């Protein structure tokens, strides 16, 4: 994937994800991309994270540029998906793509044989 936008990940999220990925082999493509994202990310302590960046347990408002649909989802660990509506696992292709993005950034992300183009609209 060329021209990837810069991403910022909290050290807390980074540590949680490394621990998760060590034991997850169900979707090797997503796991590989998450490792790549963690390797290229700027990591900061949680208290230094900008408000406009997607982290775990924050609402991400984004647009799928392929179909024009807007979505609001909370990025969570796989074990937290059932805790409420609109929860999105970090191990899903869209969840992996959104992690660390800043408002206004777009990313092309492989998913099930095609490429999704997502643009982050807001974070809450």
Predicted regions and their residues:
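N-terminal beta-hairpin/loop module of FHA
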Residues: 33-36, 73, 79
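Beta-rich strand-turn-strand
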Residues: 94-106
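Histidine- and aromatic-rich ligand-binding microenvironments
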Residues: 47, 93, 114
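N-terminal intrinsically disordered, low-complexity, charge/repeat-rich segments that act as generic
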Residues: 1-53
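FKBP-type peptidyl-prolyl cis-trans isomerase
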Residues: 54-65, 70, 74-76, 103-124
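A short acidic, glycine/proline-enriched capping/turn motif at secondary-structure boundaries
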Residues: 67, 79-82, 95
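Short, structured beta-strand/loop micro-motifs enriched in basic residues and often containing a Trp
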Residues: 42, 82-93
């Amino acid at each position: 994937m060329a021209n990837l936008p810069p991403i910022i990940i909290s050290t807390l999220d980074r540590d949680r994800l490394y621990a998760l990925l060590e034991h997850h082999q169900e979707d090797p493509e997503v796991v590989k991309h998450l490792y790549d994202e963690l390797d290229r990310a700027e990591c900061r302590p949680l208290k230094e994270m900008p408000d406009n960046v997607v982290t775990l347990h924050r609402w991400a408002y984004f647009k799928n540029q392929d179909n024009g649909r807007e979505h609001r989802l909370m990025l969570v660990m796989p074990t937290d998906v059932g805790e409420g509506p609109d929860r999105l696992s970090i191990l899903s292709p869209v969840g992996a793509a959104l992690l660390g993005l800043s408002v206004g950034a777009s990313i092309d992300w492989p998913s099930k044989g095609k490429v999704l183009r997502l643009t982050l609209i807001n974070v809450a």
